[in-house]
Amino acid sequence: MTETSPPPVLDTAQARVLGCLIEKEATTPDAYPLTVNAAQVAANQKTAREPVLNLQTGVVHHALRQLETLGLVRQQFSSRAERYEHRLGSVLDLTRQQVALIGLLLLRGPQTLGELYARSERLARFNDADDVRHHLERLIQRGLAAQLPRASGQREDRYMHLLSGELDVEALQAAAARAAPSAPSGSDSSDLDARMQALEATVVELQEALAAVQARLEAAGA
């Protein structure tokens, strides 16, 4: 694929699995590349995933093989278990920061600039929110992301990846409205967001520590 090639069109399972590979490469390097089982656990996490899914092992395995066919994933044969790593950056000629942003959008759907900046801390380094905006604009120019029109009541622009085809903007706006029917305003909202992000980060760290232990046990038994 080149900068002028159209982006691939991924289904829900493929998008989730690819996002998980991007995330875990940065957050649990000891457990990466991922086994099929580890990819399934990551795909079905209850935190840092929007929407929460319940993908079966066969669905995850099929998604990995399809991503491999598209050239976005590569299988490693270094142990008894199949392990997979993503190739998004090399295939689409993206920077680490751009790969991280695509990963977040694959895992959590439409997000604001501030959300992407806060959530990207463990995936890639950005100087500030303007740096995030710069990389988002580059992705938009490449046809890999889009800025969504603001829905009624929304104060900030949101961004979404385009790796699953054209966006249904009305459906995305309706989903956002259902997710936050009575959000608090002002400083209360900011404080709540900060507490939720801190709690979410703690839960994810515990899950990743468990995944690293499982990976070491698998390696010891290989």
Curated annotation (Swiss-Prot):
Superkingdom of the source species: Bacteria
The protein's name: UPF0502 protein XCV4380
SUPFAM superfamilies per record: Winged helix' DNA-binding domain
Similarity comment text for this entry: Belongs to the UPF0502 family.
HAMAP family listed in its UniProt record: UPF0502 (MF_01584)
